Amino acid sequence: MIQFIQHTGIVLPLDISDIDTDTIIPKQFLKATTRSNFGLYLFFNWRFLENTPKILNPNFVLNDPYYKHASILLTQRNFGCGSSREHAVWALMDYGFKVIIAPSFADIFHKNSFNNRLLLITLSELKINDLFKEIATQKKGISFTVNLHEQIIYVHNKKKCFFEINDFHKRCMLNNIDNISLTLQYDVAIKKYENNQPSYLK
């Protein structure tokens, strides 16, 4: 796992609601169990022309050269809905995304993202649309800076908006705490509890 404090990156504007996990990564690419190379198949059915899987769709925003190295995804409500597949998070992260900003996320996708340290930021639809307008008025390839410690998104080095985040999630990401290291913090208490159990439970 990687500690997350602040990230500056190019923002990919994907102004679409209800993007499901099968759109993020189609089911035919879920056979592998390692986390590498899933970025090749991210938004596969949108990135490539139908029936020509090796020809990029020039009308899809991710294929625009300005967004080739995008690492922040700005999108609309209910991102990550549909079936539960951790591969969707792996695909986004393997491609290079560190942050996703949207009005809402599917619950299971949200949990999978936290477990993999993909930062999800929830903002009101009003603020989201304001950010889309900000991008539309600028040259392509605009960058945001996301400061997790301050919980602030900066645009052109100016404070743009404050975001809320679960205190526990924030602490884990700032301090690089995963499920294993979190459990180890309570090692003494766990051993004490186990030692106090009746013999037939040990």
Swiss-Prot record:
GO cellular component, one term: 3-isopropylmalate dehydratase complex
Sorted UniProt keywords: Amino-acid biosynthesis, Branched-chain amino acid biosynthesis, Leucine biosynthesis, Lyase
Domain of life from the UniProt record: Bacteria
Database matches in Pfam families: Aconitase_C
Recorded GO MF terms: 3-isopropylmalate dehydratase activity
Pathway participation: Amino-acid biosynthesis; L-leucine biosynthesis; L-leucine from 3-methyl-2-oxobutanoate: step 2/4
Transmembrane spans: none
Gene Ontology biological-process entries: L-leucine biosynthetic process
Family to which the UniProt record says this protein belongs: Belongs to the LeuD family. LeuD type 1 subfamily.
Oligomer status and interactors: Heterodimer of LeuC and LeuD.
PANTHER family: 3-ISOPROPYLMALATE DEHYDRATASE SMALL SUBUNIT, 3-ISOPROPYLMALATE DEHYDRATASE SMALL SUBUNIT 2-RELATED-RELATED
Name used for this protein in its record: 3-isopropylmalate dehydratase small subunit
Source organism of the structure: Blochmanniella pennsylvanica (strain BPEN)
